[in-house]
Design a protein with these regions (language model features):
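Protein kinase glycine-rich loop
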Residues: 15-22, 26
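C-terminal lobe helix-coil module of Hanks-type protein kinase domains
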Residues: 157, 191-301
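Conserved short submotifs of the Hanks-type protein kinase catalytic core
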Residues: 85-99, 103
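Activation-segment/catalytic-loop signature of the eukaryotic protein kinase fold
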Residues: 81
Length: 304
């Protein structure tokens, strides 16, 4: 019913379902305009059993309003928030590619290993998007205090052209935009969340940097060291597991990269990178300090 309403009132033609997450469903669609104008977009709606719950609706609207002003090459763009007969949807940039979960699964099926430099490159592009979001201010110049809170394989896209995009700010927190229940509920995916999230504490931008470190380690090792049999076990590992010497897990990982990972994954936020810009600098220095390094074209060629 929701899709029928959207198609008829807003000139979208739904092509196929792309992704189904915990709270939302994303479809590929065509937006039609005058004189046979057609633009391929993505349409996100709330899952039906959440669509009547005020908290989910408020967060959905808050996500759209927040991301509408995040204009950055490493963040999926939002074009429009629509509503008809109580049904809300977000029209977004369509990425011709895969998320990291799909990407690494395809590599495993083909028995291919992601080159170390590309793992670091992908992570550096995530950091570029986060650095921009973390520094975002309102129109009066006041910091919004954005924290994504759900940096994970499912929420990082790789376009076949080689662009890396952060998506799904659905549980992000930001001043004045989204419902914030920190200290009451656990937000984020259990095997990527920071110790602060796992322990029901208040988060800041350094929480996203821990999750980014988990992503980098996962890309390098081909597995998530914190993933347990249950979400509860994953949270226990994040809170208590000794962070390994990554050099012993993969011979490609040298001391500088091992040190970088340990700084990202420090349980004490004060021992982590203070900003995404700092982490970005170290990531890019690692892959470019000796000269030429990976580019979007390099990643796109590898992905295709």
């Amino acid at each position: 019913v929701a899709l029928f309403t959207i198609q008829n009132e807003f000139h979208y033609e739904i092509v196929r379902k792309i992704f189904e997450g915990g709270m939302g469903i994303v479809f590929e669609a065509e937006q039609h305009g005058a004189r046979n104008f057609v633009k391929r977009v993505a349409i996100k709606i709330i899952r039906p059993h959440f669509a009547s719950q005020k908290m989910f609706i408020d967060n959905f609207i808050g996500e759209a309003k927040l991301v509408a002003d995040l204009i950055h090459t490493n963040i999926v763009q939002t074009y429009h928030l629509g509503e008809s007969k109580g049904v809300y949807f977000i029209c977004m940039e369509l990425i011709n590619g895969v998320n990291l979960e799909q990407f690494t699964r395809q590599l495993a099926e083909k028995n291919r290993q992601l080159p170390k430099e590309l793992a670091v490159f992908i992570t550096s592009r995530v950091c570029r998007g986060l650095a921009y979001a973390h520094a975002k201010t309102d129109r009066e110049g006041r910091p919004l205090g954005i924290v994504h809170r759900d940096i994970s394989f499912k929420n990082i896209m790789i376009a076949f052209e080689g662009d890396v995009k952060v998506t799904d700010f659905g549980i992000a927190k930001a001043r004045g935009f989204l419902t914030d229940q920190e200290g009451e509920v656990v937000a984020g995916k259990a095997d990527y969340m920071s110790p602060e999230q796992a322990d029901f504490q208040v988060t800041d931008k350094r929480s996203d940097l821990f999750s980014t470190g988990v992503v980098l380690a996962h890309l390098l090792l081909g597995r998530n060291i914190f993933k347990g049999e249950t979400p509860e076990e994953s949270r226990r590992r994040i809170l208590n597991m000794e962070i390994p010497d990554f050099r012993k897990l993969d011979s490609r990982i040298d001391t500088p990269l091992n040190d970088l990972l340990h700084r990202c994954l420090a349980r004490d936020p004060d021992q982590r990178y203070a900003t995404a810009d700092q982490l970005l600098y170290d990531l890019e220095y690692y892959i470019y300090h000796s000269g030429y390094g990976p580019t979007n074209e390099t990643l796109g060629k590898f992905t295709r």
